[in-house]
Amino acid sequence: MNNQCKTIAHVLRVNNGQELHVWETPPKENVPFKNNTILIASGFARRMDHFAGLAEYLSENGFHVFRYDSLHHVGLSSGSIDEFTMTTGKNSLCTVYHWLQTKGTQNIGLIAASLSARVAYEVISDLELSFLITAVGVVNLRDTLEKALGFDYLSLPIDELPNDLDFEGHKLGSEVFVRDCFEHHWDTLDSTLDKVANTSVPLIAFTANNDDWVKQEEVYDMLAHIRTGHCKLYSLLGSSHDLGENLVVLRNFYQSVTKAAIAMDGGSLEIDVDFIEPDFEQLTIATVNERRLKAEIESRTPEMA
């Protein structure tokens, strides 16, 4: 087995010299190439290397895959997470999407998890996507934040907010994040419904039956508001909001999303399709190689140390 790292690193210069890091995983040789290129938007507090396994599954099945780390987030891109806002997440996604277009990439399918799914719903009618796949996607940001943080901080006046919000062990700058939520209408379920109602982009949403942060009935509600009806919901049985909580859950996530991508690449919402599964050694090699690549990039960038 070839142990060489296949991941290709790119750096986009944005916002007066800030760096937005993008990784590319070409499709495997000797498999039929798919019609669409896949762009993966990682969930909150997840780096793009956390999705090495999913990229490997998709690549094994003929997809060209790109991932990125948002600005002001965990990972390789510029900025610190205490300045992260939902609008920053949106701008990062759109920057990578438009960069792919300038490279001549015409058919782009987006896969977005957790908080990044809310960003995807925001832009679904603005970007010319072939399809959208979301996993444990946030539809009611205020409710999810209350579940995750243990308190509805968005109910407080700005001057009564704590300095930071501890979200999955990371310190969000409370004032900048909350102001952005209200100023750009990220916070409510209704704001999500308004954004998706008129989309013509085919959508598959995966919920997790043990997810305490996202209500499945609200995801149903969102899909019911899509006027074309070109959407479908599937459940990841046995999973919580943490798709990497154990290897069984993680494998089910990889398999399900890969099958959804194959189906949607062929114009279908039915994910009962054949697919190629990479072996465990292959996944391990890809993961180790990407950790080395990440460490090498960080060692060349003093501010990341």
UniProtKB/Swiss-Prot annotation:
Gene3D superfamilies: alpha/beta hydrolase. The keyword Ligase does not apply. It comes from the Bacteria. One of its GO terms (molecular function) is acyltransferase activity, transferring groups other than amino-acyl groups. InterPro entries: AB_hydrolase_fold, LuxD. Pathway: Lipid metabolism; fatty acid reduction for biolumincescence. NCBIfam families: PRK13604.1. This is Acyl transferase.
